[in-house]
Curated annotation (Swiss-Prot):
This is Eukaryotic translation initiation factor 3 subunit F. It comes from Macaca fascicularis. GO terms for molecular function: cysteine-type deubiquitinase activity; metallopeptidase activity; translation initiation factor activity; translation initiation factor binding. Phosphorylation is enhanced upon serum stimulation. Phosphorylated during apoptosis by caspase-processed CDK11. The modification N6-acetyllysine is found at residue 242. It is an enzyme of class 3 (hydrolase). Keywords: Acetylation, Cytoplasm, Hydrolase, Initiation factor, Phosphoprotein, Protease, Protein biosynthesis, Thiol protease, Ubl conjugation pathway. Residues 96-226 form the MPN domain. Residues 1-11, 21-42, 55-78 have a biased composition (Low complexity). The modification Phosphoserine is found at residues 50, 262. It catalyses: Thiol-dependent hydrolysis of ester, thioester, amide, peptide and isopeptide bonds formed by the C-terminal Gly of ubiquitin (a 76-residue protein attached to proteins as an intracellular targeting signal). Its EC number is 3.4.19.12. Component of the eukaryotic translation initiation factor 3 (eIF-3) complex, which is composed of 13 subunits: EIF3A, EIF3B, EIF3C, EIF3D, EIF3E, EIF3F, EIF3G, EIF3H, EIF3I, EIF3J, EIF3K, EIF3L and EIF3M. The eIF-3 complex appears to include 3 stable modules: module A is composed of EIF3A, EIF3B, EIF3G and EIF3I; module B is composed of EIF3F, EIF3H, and EIF3M; and module C is composed of EIF3C, EIF3D, EIF3E, EIF3K and EIF3L. EIF3C of module C binds EIF3B of module A and EIF3H of module B, thereby linking the three modules. EIF3J is a labile subunit that binds to the eIF-3 complex via EIF3B. The keyword Flavoprotein does not apply.
C-alpha cells in the first residue's frame, strides 16, 4: 500500500505562494508545501491577477502558449466540492458534543502507539443536525512525522470509513483528532486533507501528556483570514465542548470512575443485586437533596427558582398514583414470580448435572 507523503517545507507549488497558518490561539503564515509525486496535500491556489506591471511582465509563458495567453489573468480556482457533513455555517451554536467512547478510544490508541511516535491521529465520525454536532465514533489512522514531512496512510482511512458505513450508515466524517496540547504546522497540512472530505472539519486535541495536571480537551474549526487578493492564512477558532452519553455509556463511565478510589486501579464487576442496591441508594440521596432544597425555600434560606420548581412539578406529576395496598400486592406478585423462575432454573441445572453423571457411568 503506497503511503502518501505531505512535505512540510520547500518551495511553493505555484508562482504565487498560498501560505497557511498553524497557531493554537493566534495566526501565522507559513509557505505552502510542495507535494511529492504521490502527495496528498491540498493543491496550491492558482496565482491571482496582479495590477503591478512588473509582476505581470515577470510571468512566463507555459509550453504551448503564446505570450499573449501567458499574460492573461489567472483563472479563479474552482470551489471545493461540498462534502457530506457540516454543510454551510457551523451548526449547533458552535457546540461539539462528545461521547465517552471517543475519549476512551483516543487514549487506547495513544497507549498502543508505535515506538517513537510522539502522537496519534484519527478520524472523527458522528451525526449533524440543525441544533448540534455529535461525535459518536472514531478510529485511528497510521502516520509518521518528522521535522520536514508528515506521511499519512490515507488509503487506510478511506477503507476504514467504508467499513464503518456498512455498520453505521448515518455516521459521517466530522473531522479528525490528534493527541497533544497545541497545533503544529503538520496539523495544518492534515487539516487541509480533511477539508476535502468534509466542509468545516472539526479538529479535536486531547492532551494525553497531562501538562496542567488534567487531560485538556479542545475543539477547533478553521477560518480563512487575510487581505483579499493577497496571501491567505488559516486561523483555528475554538469551539465549545460538551459531553453526551447514552444510558449504557453512563453505566460504563460510573464503573470506571470507581477505580479512582482503588489503589491498584482495578475494580470487579458487581452483581445484579448490588447494582439495584446502588441505584436505590443514589435515588435516596437525590430525594434527600430535593427535600432539603424544598425545606430551605419554604424557610426562606434559599430564594425560589421558577425553573427548578417547574421541573420538580413535572417530575411529581409523572409518578403514578397507586394505593399502598395495591402497590404491595403488585410487588409481592413480582417477587413470587422471580422466586419461581429462580427455583425452576436451579432445578433445571440440577437435572442437567444428574444426567451428565448418569451418562458417564
Amino acid at each position: 500500500m503506497a503511503t502518501p507523503v505531505v512535505s512540510a517545507s520547500g518551495p511553493p507549488a505555484t508562482p504565487a505562494p498560498a501560505p497557511v497558518a498553524a497557531p493554537a490561539s493566534a495566526s501565522a503564515s507559513v509557505p505552502a508545501p510542495t507535494p511529492a509525486p504521490a502527495a496528498a496535500a491540498v493543491p496550491a491556489a492558482a496565482p491571482a491577477a496582479s495590477s503591478d506591471p512588473a509582476a505581470a511582465a515577470a510571468t512566463t509563458a507555459a509550453p504551448g502558449q503564446t505570450p499573449a495567453s501567458a499574460q492573461a489573468p489567472a483563472q479563479t480556482p474552482a470551489p471545493a466540492l461540498p462534502g457530506p457533513a457540516l454543510p454551510g455555517p457551523f451548526p449547533g451554536g458552535r457546540v461539539v458534543r462528545l461521547h465517552p467512547v471517543i475519549l476512551a478510544s483516543i487514549v487506547d490508541s495513544y497507549e498502543r502507539r508505535n515506538e517513537g511516535a510522539a502522537r496519534v491521529i484519527g478520524t472523527l465520525l458522528g451525526t449533524v443536525d440543525k441544533h448540534s454536532v455529535e461525535v459518536t465514533n472514531c478510529f485511528s489512522v497510521p502516520h509518521n512525522e518528522s521535522e520536514d514531512e508528515v506521511a499519512v496512510d490515507m488509503e487506510f482511512a478511506k477503507n476504514m470509513y467504508e467499513l464503518h458505513k456498512k455498520v453505521s450508515p448515518n455516521e459521517l466524517i466530522l473531522g479528525w483528532y490528534a493527541t497533544g496540547h497545541d497545533i503544529t504546522e503538520h496539523s495544518v497540512l492534515i487539516h487541509e486533507y480533511y477539508s476535502r472530505e468534509a466542509p468545516n472539519p472539526i479538529h479535536l486535541t486531547v492532551d494525553t501528556s497531562l501538562q496542567n495536571g488534567r487531560m485538556s480537551i479542545k475543539a477547533y474549526v478553521s477560518t480563512l483570514m487575510g487581505v483579499p487578493g493577497r496571501t491567505m492564512g488559516v486561523m483555528f477558532t475554538p469551539l465549545t465542548v460538551k459531553y453526551a452519553y447514552y444510558d449504557t455509556e453512563r453505566i460504563g463511565v460510573d464503573l470506571i470512575m470507581k477505580t479512582c478510589f482503588s489503589p491498584n486501579r482495578v475494580i470487579g464487576l458487581s452483581s445484579d443485586l448490588q447494582q439495584v442496591g446502588g441505584a436505590s441508594a443514589r435515588i435516596q440521596d437525590a430525594l434527600s437533596t430535593v427535600l432539603q432544597y424544598a425545606e430551605d425555600v419554604l424557610s426562606g434560606k434559599v430564594s425560589a427558582d421558577n425553573t427548578v420548581g417547574r421541573f420538580l412539578m413535572s417530575l411529581v406529576n409523572q409518578v403514578p398514583k397507586i394505593v399502598p395496598d395495591d402497590f404491595e400486592t403488585m410487588l409481592n406478585s413480582n417477587i413470587n414470580d422471580l422466586l419461581m423462575v429462580t427455583y425452576l432454573a436451579n432445578l433445571t441445572q440440577s437435572q442437567i448435572a444428574l444426567n451428565e453423571k448418569l451418562v458417564n457411568l
